[in-house]
Protein backbone atom coordinates (compact mmCIF):
# COMPACT_ATOMS: atom_id res chain seq x y z
CA UNK A 1 0.00 0.00 0.00
CA UNK A 2 1.30 3.42 -0.92
CA UNK A 3 2.22 6.05 1.61
CA UNK A 4 0.70 9.48 1.22
CA UNK A 5 2.28 10.99 -1.89
CA UNK A 6 3.89 14.40 -1.30
CA UNK A 7 3.86 17.34 -3.68
CA UNK A 8 7.39 17.90 -4.99
CA UNK A 9 9.38 20.62 -6.71
CA UNK A 10 11.05 19.74 -10.01
CA UNK A 11 14.53 19.27 -8.52
CA UNK A 12 13.13 17.06 -5.75
CA UNK A 13 11.34 14.87 -8.30
CA UNK A 14 14.51 14.56 -10.38
CA UNK A 15 16.56 13.53 -7.31
CA UNK A 16 13.86 11.00 -6.43
CA UNK A 17 13.73 9.32 -9.84
CA UNK A 18 17.52 9.38 -10.23
CA UNK A 19 17.85 7.56 -6.90
CA UNK A 20 15.50 4.95 -8.40
CA UNK A 21 17.77 4.29 -11.36
CA UNK A 22 16.46 6.78 -13.94
CA UNK A 23 18.86 8.79 -16.06
CA UNK A 24 18.67 12.02 -18.03
CA UNK A 25 18.00 11.13 -21.68
CA UNK A 26 17.77 14.43 -23.56
CA UNK A 27 16.17 17.88 -23.71
CA UNK A 28 12.63 17.92 -25.03
CA UNK A 29 10.62 20.75 -26.52
CA UNK A 30 10.10 23.83 -24.39
CA UNK A 31 10.54 23.22 -20.68
CA UNK A 32 10.49 19.43 -20.94
CA UNK A 33 13.33 17.06 -20.13
CA UNK A 34 13.22 13.39 -20.97
CA UNK A 35 14.37 10.76 -18.49
CA UNK A 36 14.84 7.05 -19.15
CA UNK A 37 14.66 3.93 -16.99
CA UNK A 38 15.89 0.54 -18.19
CA UNK A 39 14.03 -2.43 -16.70
CA UNK A 40 14.05 -6.05 -17.84
CA UNK A 41 15.34 -5.12 -21.30
CA UNK A 42 12.70 -2.41 -21.70
CA UNK A 43 13.43 1.28 -22.03
CA UNK A 44 10.85 3.68 -20.58
CA UNK A 45 11.25 7.31 -21.61
CA UNK A 46 9.12 9.84 -19.71
CA UNK A 47 8.89 13.61 -20.32
CA UNK A 48 8.91 15.86 -17.26
CA UNK A 49 7.73 19.48 -17.43
CA UNK A 50 10.49 21.43 -15.67
CA UNK A 51 8.55 24.71 -15.91
CA UNK A 52 6.17 23.74 -13.11
CA UNK A 53 6.83 25.30 -9.71
CA UNK A 54 5.47 22.32 -7.79
CA UNK A 55 4.07 18.98 -8.92
CA UNK A 56 0.82 17.77 -7.38
CA UNK A 57 0.71 14.35 -5.68
CA UNK A 58 -1.33 12.74 -8.51
CA UNK A 59 1.19 14.03 -11.09
CA UNK A 60 4.14 12.66 -9.07
CA UNK A 61 2.43 9.26 -8.84
CA UNK A 62 1.66 9.28 -12.57
CA UNK A 63 5.32 9.98 -13.41
CA UNK A 64 6.51 7.17 -11.13
CA UNK A 65 3.96 4.76 -12.63
CA UNK A 66 5.05 5.66 -16.18
CA UNK A 67 8.59 4.64 -15.22
CA UNK A 68 7.20 1.29 -14.05
CA UNK A 69 7.86 1.61 -10.32
CA UNK A 70 5.84 -0.76 -8.12
CA UNK A 71 4.13 0.28 -4.88
CA UNK A 72 6.99 -1.19 -2.84
CA UNK A 73 9.61 0.61 -4.93
CA UNK A 74 7.74 3.91 -4.58
CA UNK A 75 7.52 3.50 -0.80
CA UNK A 76 11.26 2.77 -0.69
CA UNK A 77 12.02 5.90 -2.74
CA UNK A 78 9.88 8.08 -0.48
CA UNK A 79 11.70 7.05 2.70
Q: At which residue positions do the language-model features occur?
A:
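Basic nucleic-acid-binding interfaces
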Residues: 1-29, 34-79
